[in-house]
Amino acid sequence: TKTLRNLILSGVFFGITMYSYALSYFLIPIFLICISLYLLYTKEISFRRVLLWAACVCITALPVILFVCSLLFHWETIHFLGLTISPIASERMSDVGVTSFWENIKDIIKITLTCGSYRLDAVPKFYTLYPLSIPFIVLGFIGAVYSFLVSLCKRTFQADSIYLLFFLSGLITIGLSGSGYVYRANSFFICYLFFLIKGLFLCCHFLSSYHTGFMLLLS
């Protein structure tokens, strides 16, 4: 946020990311709104720069935005810069809703941390992630929430908040759209890795007097 060049580049790259897969055009806007509000609150960015950032994202992702608008408003086929944008998947918008929001969130957390009904996603008892890592992921998540709340109280930026807000944005996206597939929640795993590392760090810090033995046990 301090360098104009980096701000513009990040906006362009976020815009490009919205082309990657179907849920990106839900996830990325939700995350950018959350992180923008957080950066504004902690005074890490000015409102003018937020508008510039948003403009870079929107210009880069304009075909995707037009596609989403064609789904929402049932527009006719659009010809834009040599692209043909047609609402060919308009019926999928009916999947978006809030009626099963909490159920969808509970299901995707279970599937990504353990296993679901699809045998190709994860083997029962071995899980998607190693069972030993799950308590540390939970601990790291709690630690990230605590850091986020402290940063709100002190109005200071905490890097943990980026991963936490990205994870929460993913939960909101899945909650609204619903999915029983692990690949629809790929964004979770970078957050799980961060929470795992943070959880291990918190345990090592708490058990500092037993640091060597604790690390040998984990090994």
Give the location of each predicted region.
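Membrane-interfacial loop-to-transmembrane alpha-helix junctions, especially the N-terminal start
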Residues: T3-N6, V50, L152-F166, T212-L216
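Specific aromatic-rich, kink-prone transmembrane helix
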Residues: T1, N6, S10-F14, L32, ...
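Structural signal for the C-terminal ends of transmembrane alpha-helices
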Residues: T1, I33-I45, A144-C153, L200-S208
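Transmembrane alpha-helix segments characteristic
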Residues: F14, A54, C58, L132-L176, ...
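Hydrophobic/aromatic-rich transmembrane helices and adjacent perimembrane loops
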Residues: F26, D160-L207
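Membrane-interface alpha helices of multi-pass inner-membrane proteins
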Residues: L7-A22, L171-I172
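Transmembrane-lumen/periplasm boundary regions of multi-pass, lipid-linked membrane glycan transferases
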Residues: I16, I28-V145
